[in-house]
Amino acid sequence: MGDSLFLTGADLAALAFFLAVWLVHGLAADGKLVGRMSLTTAMNAQREAWMRTMAQRELRMIDTSIMVGLQQGTAFFASSSLLALGGCFALLGASNDVLSVLSDLPLADAPPRQVFEIKVLGLMALLAYAFFKFGWSYRLFNYCSILIGAVPMHKEGSAAPAAMEAAIGRATRMNVLAGRHFNAGLRGVFFSLGYLGWFVGPEAFALTTTLLFAVLLRRQFFSAARLAVIDESAQAGPGNGSSIRPDSQ
């Protein structure tokens, strides 16, 4: 690689491939690209089933515990993304040491320092994106907790079924939307792992992106987890004809 500040054609092609794969995976996971149900859309149907079951319970401590678990998991990933982002700042300060290590690898020549720093900035952008997605998801789960509290008790809902249905719909849509942003943040973390291949070279970047894409597709469409969730009710869930499918992010 030359001493230019600009990325090579191979670098740009690998980066474009990476972004295209990210976009395709996101659309496929949300049920907007292929007819086969993904694990994400199947779980969205289960979120709706959860809200309907919750509305039938007089005591909702189990639902509160589930929400706490979702919030804690989201907070963990948000904190981890922030720590990784701080590590990238340290990486920028140790650029010479990292380039020395890369120069010893037989796979590719070490890039110029300026190009290396551009790649680190790209990694920081990925982690910042993931952090903001996790942060917003955490807040949406908070909102969902409030909406769950606003769902009438079963006896009251029986007297006003329309109000009960509207409250269930609000809680479901908020829960699905919170899950969507959490999945987007998780996708950013996963793809940041594939992004690491770019520090070796554009060929390695394309290879790690392809391998990551294959793993994520298998989990979404061909995994045991998907088979455990899929049933007739899920076939009508969000992303496959259900009215509970928020389009805005």
Locations of regions flagged by a protein language model:
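Juxtamembrane "helix exit" motif at the C-terminal ends of alpha-helical transmembrane segments
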Residues: 1-3, 82-109, 197-206, 212-217
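Cytosolic juxtamembrane amphipathic/interface segments immediately preceding
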Residues: 2-3, 54-70, 168-176
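Hydrophobic alpha-helical transmembrane segments
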Residues: 5-16, 107-122, 202-207
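Hydrophobic alpha-helical membrane-embedded segments
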Residues: 11-39, 75-89, 120-142, 189-190
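Membrane-interface amphipathic/juxtamembrane segments adjacent to transmembrane helices
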Residues: 29-67
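Transmembrane alpha-helical segments and their cytosolic interface motifs
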Residues: 63-89, 116, 120, 133, ...
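Alpha-helical transmembrane segments of helical membrane proteins, especially in multi-pass transport
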Residues: 129-198
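Cytosolic/matrix-facing juxtamembrane and C-terminal tails of multi-pass cellular membrane proteins
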Residues: 149-157, 163-172, 219-249
